[in-house]
Amino acid sequence: MELAEIRNELEKTAQQIKDFRGSLDLDSMEVRIAELEDQMLDPNFWNDQQAAQKVINESNGYKETYQAFHALEEEQESMEISLELLKEEADEDLQEELEKDIKAYMATISAFELKLMLSDPYDKNNAILELHPGAGGTESQDWGSMLLRMYQRWSEKKGFKVEMLDYQAGDEAGIKSVTLLIKGHNAYGYLKAEKGVHRLVRISPFDSSGRRHTSFVSVDVMPELDGDIEIEVRTEDLKIDTYRATGAGGQHINTTDSAVRMTHIPSGIVVTCQSERSQLKNREQAMKMLKTKLYQKEQEEKERELAEIRGEQKEIGWGSQIRSYVFHPYSMVKDHRTNYETGNIQAVMDGDLDDFINAYLRSRIG
């Protein structure tokens, strides 16, 4: 890279930093961080643990953005100083180091820009992720367990906490359905990119003839909503069943009927929860999930109406196939919405999803 090219790249990144500063109200951010820190110093702060966690998450989100922006500014300044030194006197080692730094810096800017894109009202929330294998018995249920592992690995890499709200084991292998609560800042903002049908093509390990099989799993993703959302659920509209909680392999993990299945009769929505040992807590969590689903249904209906008014042929919901994972006759994972693809299928199954998620989020604002 010639010095003129380095200068051009640094001029571009300097403009990006300027644009970031224009879109971030840093003064207001400082004030809000101070307010939240004052709340955390209150002796009664932990009396309401749910409210306390909400304050901590908000504070961490602002701090992360604030610190990341200032780190970008400092790095920009440092590289501009290196460029000035190179103009005064050629230094091969310094130039090589600067070229590497610029490449890494551009990737960091890209990641920062992506975080700023997560500005929808619930992007910052925790995510509820459900996996539902399609028809195909053991084959599709095994595919469900592979996706479960993939999302668990991705969450670990992000530093997110995963709670298993519900687990229904498959008949021979895999899962019949799973509900996860993924806790972390912007968890929903990222994972909304995964909503849809995921298709697998492989030689089935369950087929003695070694034939190729195609399996489908639908992934549904919702933000975990707090108590601020007003959704009325009438007691007479509910059917509540209780049963023994089961774990992987089908064994009972509790001796009482602590697991809860809640059916909302007017909408047909069913939610289940067995993560807690107490039936009462499982009821509370199931009600929270039900309200989230009812709210989501309401929002999707509004979106559908708006699309019809505008004359848009826009599919809403999770019924569309979004991504294919092909293990045979070649290795390829391809997202059908963005056309982003990779041949490194094992890395994807080990949780390397960020490139797919990033491509989707960028396509939404493109």
Swiss-Prot record:
GO cellular component terms listed in the entry, alphabetical order: cytoplasm
Gene Ontology BP, a term: viral translational frameshifting
Family: Belongs to the prokaryotic/mitochondrial release factor family.
Record localization: Cytoplasm
Primary location class: cytoplasm
SUPFAM superfamilies: Release factor (SSF75620)
Post-translational changes noted in the entry: Methylated by PrmC. Methylation increases the termination efficiency of RF2.
Keywords: Cytoplasm, Methylation, Protein biosynthesis
GO molecular-function term, one example from the UniProt record: translation release factor activity, codon specific
Protein name, entry field: Peptide chain release factor 2
Additional record remark: The gene for this protein contains a UGA in-frame termination codon after Leu-24; a naturally occurring frameshift enables complete translation of RF-2. This provides a mechanism for the protein to regulate its own production.
InterPro entries attached to this UniProt entry: PCRF, Pep_chain_release_fac_I, Pep_chain_release_fac_I_sf, PrfB
Upper classification of the organism: Bacteria, Bacillati, Bacillota, Bacilli, Bacillales
PROSITE patterns given in the database record: RF_PROK_I
PANTHER family in the record: CLASS I PEPTIDE CHAIN RELEASE FACTOR, PEPTIDE CHAIN RELEASE FACTOR 2
Positions of modified residues (N5-methylglutamine): 251
Function: Peptide chain release factor 2 directs the termination of translation in response to the peptide chain termination codons UGA and UAA.
